[in-house]
């Protein structure tokens, strides 16, 4: 089965979907051959992968991407608490030091859907519904990643923020300040004063301000304005915006999956992805990092002997079953440089 054959099969399907009657006739005939459904399936998988890669996910702007080897709970380890380097006098032994280890757990899970393509649908000219199937499935995969990642910021029932992560014991209990210049500045100052287990000051990483759509323009106005104008008595005073460029604004509609009354006012301050202390991780399984599309070979055998082409449909219901699978997981792991406020 060559790449050329796969491409030709998909192009035939594409022309038939566009209303080419000759292509429709050729496709109906081709569905009775044993290899055409396989070729078409491979073509879908190739187009699905291309469409998937072309979509830029929002979650990648505030969560760190990682891979796992299996479905078992995974441990993300950090070596913390070292005391730094000490002066070593001439001809003396280097001083020993210990690391403390902090562990955070997360897990990848399997998601999917079956889709049935029937002979009747082709004959009855209903191919148009499948013309952009790869785009639809690619978007569904990206949507899944987005909801899984955003849900890590929420509790299990999505009725509030994740209070197992945002809590007083972690130094990031939910606040109730509306998003303003003052509250954002105070939040940045709060996370900038973090220390490690030995009391050593930590260097603040780049930060992202993650907001729902209702706070988008308010957030952008706060951090994108180069100057601020205010009135002092009868005088208009112009000053530099000290928050300009201080954080990167990320707007994630998936935050509105929360049913909390203040979901549209809730804002998060998180470390940028791929920093030393990531707040969130989004996990994929190694070797299965993109959506997988397959067909089901369950058409049975003829009574008189001989195999039946996949294109003639399954034994049970005459459908050609395609199945898409995507493996992903997400979790909140390190609370060090995080802040959340439900607004007021």
Walk through the language-model features, giving the residues of each.
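Short gly/pro-enriched beta-turn/loop segments at secondary-structure junctions
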Residues: 197, 202-206
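Assembly/oligomerization interface modules of large self-assembling protein complexes
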Residues: 28-111
